Structure formats: structure tokens, C-alpha cells
A protein has these predicted regions:
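Catalytic loop of short-chain dehydrogenase/reductase
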Residues: 4-72, 83
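Rossmann-like NAD(H)/NADP(H) cofactor-binding core
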Residues: 11, 77, 138
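Conserved catalytic-core motifs of eukaryotic protein kinase domains, centered on the activation segment
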Residues: 22-24, 89-94, 151-153
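Short C-terminal tail/terminal secondary-structure segment
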Residues: 25, 136-155
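A short C-terminal helix-loop "cap" of Rossmann-like NAD(P)-dependent dehydrogenase/epimerase domains
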Residues: 32-42, 94-109
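Short, small/polar-rich loop/turn modules that mediate ligand/substrate recognition or access, typified
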Residues: 70, 75, 135-137
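Short, flexible catalytic-loop segment of classical short-chain dehydrogenase/reductase
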Residues: 81-91
Length: 155
């Protein structure tokens, strides 16, 4: 339907963890669509590696397909949320094992607070609207400045 109307917008969800992936072989398998090999490799690496790798694959797929989609009238972007307060993250923050580490992590967010669902929703709403018509093929970090702090020379 988007292609038929030649006037669509797509927003993918990546993560600010995507640049931290240290398993390019896993990302390459995901991008190649080799699900059995990717699943087999995922069984041998850490959960963080599979998470960041899958999010990196989303961002790379988007960038590789941006020109073709834009030529067909489809704008595509991705958001890369950082730590966001949700019922799931609240449970981890209150966990006796992980709680202290989460509190330390949260104190390192440059803007001084974790993300809220509405922070993500506001950006998605903007990207889906007319005021973002020239933004295409971008990964926008919504992480309170964490990515800029951790990777100041990478963009």
C-alpha cells in the first residue's frame, strides 16, 4: 500500500546498543536472511551480543534500502532508544541482583533521567508527519545523550 501511494513513512526501532555489537558475523547472517545459521550462532553468544546485533542489523538494513525506498516515495528512518522506564525495566531496577547496577547506569545518563515512553512516541509522531519530509535514512538516538557521551567521535 505504501508503494502504491508513493507517499509513506516507516519508522523502525533499533537501539542505542546497536553500535556496541562485537559480532559482525551474527549481523551478516541476519542481513543475509540465514535464519538457521543466525539461530545456531545466537545459541553460542551472549544475550547482549544477540540483542545489539539484531538492532544493528535493523539499522544497517534500513540504510541499505533507503535509496530504493526513497525513490519509490517511501521515507524510512529508525529510532534508537536508550534506557526507557517501563514496567519491565522497573522490575529490573528493583531487582536485588541487578538494581544497584541499573541505578549506577541511570546516573550516567547525561540529561539526568531515563527515557519515558512518550519521549519515543513524540519522535515517532514527528517522523511520521509532514515536518520530517526531508529526513530519510537516519538513525536518531533517543537516549538522553548516552551515545554521544560513549562514542563522541562516531556518527
Amino acid at each position: 500500500d505504501l508503494l502504491a501511494s508513493r507517499n509513506g513513512r516507516v519508522v523502525l526501532i533499533s537501539s542505542n546498543s546497536a553500535p556496541m555489537c562485537d559480532r559482525p558475523d551474527y549481523v551478516d547472517l541476519l542481513l543475509a536472511g540465514d535464519e538457521p545459521a543466525a539461530a545456531a550462532l545466537a545459541d553460542t553468544i551472549t544475550g547482549q551480543q544477540t540483542y545489539s546485533g539484531s538492532k544493528q542489523a535493523i539499522a544497517r538494513w534500513m540504510r541499505r534500502n533507503t535509496a530504493d525506498l526513497a525513490a519509490q516515495g517511501i521515507s524510512i528512518n529508525a529510532i534508537a532508544p536508550g534506557y526507557t522506564e517501563t514496567p519491565m525495566t522497573a522490575a529490573v531496577a528493583n531487582d536485588p541482583i541487578y538494581g544497584d547496577a541499573i541505578k549506577k547506569f541511570l546516573s550516567s545518563i547525561p540529561v539526568g533521567r531515563p527515557g519515558r515512553p512518550e519521549d519515543m512516541a513524540d519522535l515517532v509522531e514527528f517522523l511520521l508527519g509532514e515536518k520530517s519530509s526531508f529526513i530519510c535514512g537516519s538513525v536518531l538516538f533517543v537516549d538522553g545523550g548516552h551515545d554521544a557521551m560513549l562514542r563522541p567521535d562516531a556518527f
